[in-house]
């Protein structure tokens, strides 16, 4: 093959017959006549044939042999401006605006109500998109000569129809996904802009002189979108990755086979741009897998080595939270990094790609705790999957229509088995001799024999002295034993009614109040400055952090951050915040009020919060659960608990506390209420 390339290069340099070289190796379906002295068509740098009036300066440049980078840049700029004023660029711009409006439409509607699309509408829309893509697929296959009855001689009409079918499928997918609040299945390998540029180049070609690489690119774009709508139609989104793996493996096999048989004559620059990443990932995965198998064969226990690799793959899949709806290139890239790493490091999705449902997507800064992430409206995207009912709960297309055959099959099998059992039982009874059936003997109910006259014999113990033990058999059937060996019954001592549980509880409560009053009196008499309070709170917080980090069981890799400490030791963080708020409110004299103060009187305290439970309070207690002073005005999401004030929320947030103080669930955001 290298010898042939050298011969062509020598011929090119000797004769400068550039067009004969390109026309014979561009992979056209119909080759030009070799006797043509001045061909009417030429090729672009990506081996794609376009019409002469578009780039005639490039033809003159190649004929003169003055091929420089500057002249090539001028031709590229002229080609770009020619595409920019074409109808394909206008269609691409219009499609992008429509897709953007459909995406933003979900954020403009009210968050209080959930929109549910009926099953028939979703099925109808996906069916329309599927039929449109099938029509586009048949037109593309007709360009390869597979279906002559569908062949279109007008290349402009062919390119426009394919583009409109693909754009319609994208609009339907974006509309349904944005309406039902589910992630959209997009095909980023074949964008609308690249598709429009490719179709613009095809529209400038005469019929029968299209480059095979351009049509292969269209084939891949239609196939990938067809897989998306099929999995949506049958409600099997988790199998989207399987379909893309089959498509990429099929294209890879076809390209390798054609390259081996006919060389690289069918490849152009657009084909390399769209297919090369996927092919590179597949080649890397195959080579790495072969190396792993060969390494396992030369080990003492090959099955154990392969099993450990399988466990690594399983851990990699779980750690990245893959569900089968991702694109092939995303999964393949992560798998290549895993297979080619020497330290078996699990590359997570969060290392390179941020998930759209993370808390960081709602703000531009890194959120240490959800208590610092303010949300202005009801966050439906933070609610759990069980609470969200945006999608239709009706059965899918397959279960609705194809399930009818399963129902008919079940009914036929049930009645056939019943008829078979009836016929078999009749034949069996007629063929065997009739034998007398022995009925089961019913047990006698002894209670029927007990009457008003003889009940004493059953319920009373006869006098043993009057009975002859040897002759009278009734002595053996006595209901009660002769001697009672059980312990005697002693009634308990009477409880002193003067002492009750209520008085005991009231005594404990009064003692608690007295102790609290003493502590608060001591604190009020020794009030300190705010700076000293902050230093005390800081010392207490640092002491708890150092005490936690010095424990052998709490070692972490690297420095201990606030978020890590908040997740690992939430109880310690909560205690620190309670102490901090208690010191603040005690020093500011918020927790109590002095009433009727005189020189000879004792201190009388009136607490702002009740010591009793909420059931015993006449009105609802809206005091904060942490400081017990301020009113609750913070709602945490997605648990919807109203338990904190704004000051305690700030303290918990900056200390990395990530759970709710009421229900102990993860907090992803908060909203502030104005309670009157």
Curated annotation (Swiss-Prot):
Membrane topology: Multi-pass membrane protein
Record keywords: Glycoprotein, Membrane, Metal-binding, Nucleus, Transferase, Transmembrane, Transmembrane helix, Zinc, Zinc-finger
Catalytic activity: S-ubiquitinyl-[E2 ubiquitin-conjugating enzyme]-L-cysteine + [acceptor protein]-L-lysine = [E2 ubiquitin-conjugating enzyme]-L-cysteine + N(6)-ubiquitinyl-[acceptor protein]-L-lysine
Entries under Pfam families matching the protein: zf-C3HC4_3
Nuclear-side positions: 100-126, 178-181, 299-676
Major localisation: nucleus
Compartment(s) of residence: Nucleus inner membrane
Listed EC numbers: 2.3.2.27
Residue ranges, Perinuclear space side: 1-78, 148-156, 203-277
Chain ranges passing through the membrane: 79-99, 127-147, 157-177, 182-202, 278-298
Classification via InterPro entries: Znf_RING/FYVE/PHD (IPR013083)
Zinc finger (RING-type) boundaries: 624-664
MF terms (GO), sorted A to Z: ubiquitin protein ligase activity; ubiquitin-protein transferase activity; zinc ion binding
Broad EC category: transferase
Function comment: Part of the nuclear inner membrane (INM)-specific branch of the ER-associated degradation (ERAD) pathway, required for the elimination of misfolded proteins in the INM, a specialized ER subdomain. Required for ERG11 degradation. Negative regulator of SPS-sensor signaling. Together with ASI2 and ASI3, prevents the unprocessed precursor forms of STP1 and STP2 that escape cytoplasmic anchoring from inducing SPS-sensor-regulated genes in the absence of inducing signals.
Subunit structure: Component of the Asi complex, which contains ASI1, ASI2 and ASI3. Interacts directly with ASI1.
This protein's name: Probable ERAD-associated E3 ubiquitin-protein ligase ASI1
Lineage of source species: Eukaryota, Fungi, Dikarya, Ascomycota, Saccharomycotina
Gene name in the database record: ASI3
